[in-house]
Curated annotation (Swiss-Prot):
Cofactors: Zn(2+); Cu(2+)
Stretch list, region Involved in wound healing: 51-56
UniProt family annotation: Belongs to the histatin/statherin family.
Region forming the signal peptide: 1-19
InterPro entries for the chain: Histatin/statherin
Designated name of the protein: Histatin-1
Domain notes: The wound healing domain in C-terminus may promote cell migration and proliferation.
Keyword Zinc on entry: no
UniProt source species: Homo sapiens
Presence of the UniProt keyword Mitochondrion in the record: yes
BP terms from Gene Ontology: biomineral tissue development; defense response to bacterium; defense response to fungus; killing of cells of another organism; positive regulation of cell-cell adhesion; positive regulation of metabolic process; positive regulation of substrate adhesion-dependent cell spreading; positive regulation of vascular wound healing
A cellular-component GO term for this protein: extracellular region
Length: 57
């Protein structure tokens, strides 16, 4: 389970890093669009990298 969470966080970080170049072009539109359609309940580690989510398991 820990490996799965680690891989998911790593993939999320890679996707965020690759989106940085596009984010400058779109002035942060992609990030606002993402936050509007995905709640923190769906991705509990998105906001603070899951200080609560990782330790609860």
């Amino acid at each position: 389970m820990k490996f799965f969470v680690f891989a998911l966080v790593l993939a999320l970080m890679i996707s965020m890093i690759s989106a940085d170049s596009h984010e400058k072009r779109h002035h942060g539109y992609r990030r606002k669009f993402h936050e509007k359609h995905h709640s923190h309940r769906e991705f509990p580690f998105y906001g603070d990298y899951g200080s609560n989510y990782l330790y609860d398991n």
